[in-house]
Amino acid sequence: YPAREGKDGKPYSSATSTKLEAGGNWVKNGDVTDDWGVIQLNSNIGNKVGWLGLKYQAGAYTGNVTVAGYPRDVRGGYYFDNPYMFKHTSAISSDDKWRMLYYKNLDTSAGQSGAPVYQYYADTGYTAIAIHRGQNNSTNVGVRIHEWLFNKLVSYR
């Protein structure tokens, strides 16, 4: 349900999956640098609700990043199907060619893996630069969108 807000807030109806794809090295041997997935939908819902920009760059990213998603541990409960979107922003602590680390004060939990990690750019608006993959005690981590992954993601549009 794109733009879902609450139990009944479904302004764009629904879309269903027609194809699933995941990073081959993640599937074969759990390689965390290839931990990404794509769900192809039965409609071009992005033509109705808009598209999040995508970007890759060779150099390091700086500044803040935001993660938005539907965490499971919200509003005093633990939901399998949380209907409320939350977003948090934090500084990038480090990144390299394959991964990006951002500080723990960017609150994420189970259910947000696969969410976009994004920044705002004047020329492209809100733009995904990584894919959230998880957290540990002090840091969140995302898979950076590098050139090959950028081209793969764009091919689904």
PLM feature spans:
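Acidic glycine-/aspartate-rich tracts in secreted/extracellular proteins
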Residues: A3-K7, N42-G46, P71-D73, A122-T124, ...
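Short Gly/Pro-enriched turn/cap motifs at secondary-structure boundaries
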Residues: V27-G30, V74, N105-S109
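Short glycine/Trp-rich loop-beta-loop segment that forms part of the substrate-binding cleft
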Residues: Q40-G46, L52-D81
